[in-house]
């Protein structure tokens, strides 16, 4: 059973709980059930300077506009289906509802065109309900857009586009109308979920909490979760968590990984990557094809025709690459230095790392994204 004396004693012990290279518990774990919720809505942006949807190609924009007018008692005359609304665009609106958000608070929203609008710059979002996955309305969005890009087009068809003008944001553009139920104050325990599951980190969290608050307060569920006993009183529970989230924990070392992005040529090598003894050589074959066409000119009065005769030259060159050797326990710095000495390009380094992994010499997970 928790009481005020135990919380005060734990607070006084916090000054002794800081490590040299530790991280706060709030930075490596989250409380189960305390999370953001996604909201989405559909609406109209008006006031555009001729950059709205072409309603002949996006009929849903005109349909939405007519439905809005009907709510104000305005009837669109029959036969006006081909009207062009150059300053209106159909958009999707989404936002993240933070945990513990209460009615009356505001959240930021993102507005994105779903038609063929060229730009949302200068537009205003009309009142749009934002719903959760359960279909209930949790917020109402409205306001003027902030767009970071722009689009300009000349009469001859030339155009310039900077960033993405078809999406924008409205800071504080949605007002919360309904709170999301939370199980934060239910039960006599809370579960801490590690952002990066690790058995060593989970054990160190349990040891640190039990050292501070007493044996048996924290128990490891698995490598990614730790269950801690918590006071039932909401006020004491908040004080209790403020102590826990500021505990300094020394996390376990991450698994050695090499990340390769084959599309961009980006390679990230983790600090704990090591290579077993291996010898590597990587040569490259360069094939050059040049086209040097010649013109065949017939002699005078020969009734011949001038013709272009193609002439291709193919040259193959094999570059000699030196062999370099990795000793036992080679570190990241030594790998990078050895590869740079032979002038390997990112594509060459990818091939070398993949070959080392296949040979069993790369002591790390090789992940291609």
From Swiss-Prot:
Asked whether the keyword Transferase is assigned, the reply is no
Main location class: periplasm
Please, which domain of life does this record's source organism belong to? Bacteria
- In the UniProt record, does the keyword Signal occur? yes
Instruction: Name its GO BP terms in alphabetical order.
Output: bacterial-type flagellum-dependent cell motility
Give the keywords, sorted: Bacterial flagellum, Periplasm, Signal
The cellular location(s) given in this protein's UniProt record come to: Periplasm; Bacterial flagellum basal body
Signal peptide per UniProt = 1-22
One Pfam family recorded for the sequence: FlgI
The protein's matches in InterPro entries, at most eight in alphabetical order, are given as: Flag_FlgI
The Gene Ontology CC terms held by the record are: bacterial-type flagellum basal body, distal rod, P ring; outer membrane-bounded periplasmic space
Could you give a GO molecular-function term held by this entry? Answer: structural molecule activity
Family matches, as NCBIfam families: PRK05303.1
> Subunit structure, briefly?
The basal body constitutes a major portion of the flagellar organelle and consists of four rings (L,P,S, and M) mounted on a central rod.
Task: Give the similarity note.
Answer: Belongs to the FlgI family.
What this chain does, per the record? Assembles around the rod to form the L-ring and probably protects the motor/basal body from shearing forces during rotation.
HAMAP family the UniProt entry points to: FlgI (MF_00416)
Name the UniProt record assigns to this protein: Flagellar P-ring protein
What is the originating organism of this protein? Pseudomonas entomophila (strain L48)
């Amino acid at each position: 059973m928790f009481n005020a004396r135990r919380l005060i004693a734990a607070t006084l012990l916090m000054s002794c709980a800081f490590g040299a290279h530790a991280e706060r518990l709030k930075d490596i774990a989250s409380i189960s059930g305390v999370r953001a919720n996604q909201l989405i809505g559909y609406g109209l942006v008006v006031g555009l300077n001729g950059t709205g949807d072409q309603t002949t190609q996006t009929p849903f924009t005109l349909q939405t506009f007519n439905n809005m007018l009907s709510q104000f008692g305005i009837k669109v005359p029959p036969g006006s289906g081909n009207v062009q609304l150059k300053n209106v665009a159909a958009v999707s609106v989404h936002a993240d509802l933070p945990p513990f958000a209460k009615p009356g608070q505001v959240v930021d929203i993102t507005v994105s065109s779903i038609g063929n609008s060229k730009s949302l710059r200068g537009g205003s979002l009309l009142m749009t309900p934002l719903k959760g996955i359960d279909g209930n309305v949790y917020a109402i969005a409205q306001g003027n857009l902030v767009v970071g890009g722009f689009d300009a087009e000349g009469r001859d068809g030339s155009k310039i586009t900077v960033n993405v003008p078809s999406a924008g944001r409205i800071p504080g553009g949605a007002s919360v109308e309904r709170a999301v139920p939370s199980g934060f104050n239910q039960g006599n325990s809370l579960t801490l979920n590690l952002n990066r599951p690790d058995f060593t980190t989970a054990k160190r969290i349990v040891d640190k909490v039990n050292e501070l608050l007493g044996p048996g307060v924290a128990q490891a569920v698995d490598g990614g979760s730790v269950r801690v006993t918590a006071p039932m009183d909401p006020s004491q529970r908040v004080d209790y968590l403020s102590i826990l989230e500021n505990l300094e924990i020394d996390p376990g070392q991450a698994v050695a990984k090499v990340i390769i992005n084959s599309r961009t040529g980006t390679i990230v090598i983790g600090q704990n990557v090591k290579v077993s003894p291996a010898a590597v050589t990587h040569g490259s074959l360069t094939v050059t094809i040049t086209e040097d066409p010649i013109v065949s000119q017939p002699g005078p009065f020969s009734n011949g025709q001038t013709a272009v005769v193609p002439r291709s030259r193919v040259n193959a060159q094999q570059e000699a690459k030196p062999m370099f050797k990795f000793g036992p326990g080679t570190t990241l710095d030594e790998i990078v230095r050895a590869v740079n000495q032979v002038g390997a390009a990112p594509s060459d380094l990818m091939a070398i790392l993949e070959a080392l992994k296949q040979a069993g010499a790369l002591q790390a997970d090789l992940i291609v994204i």
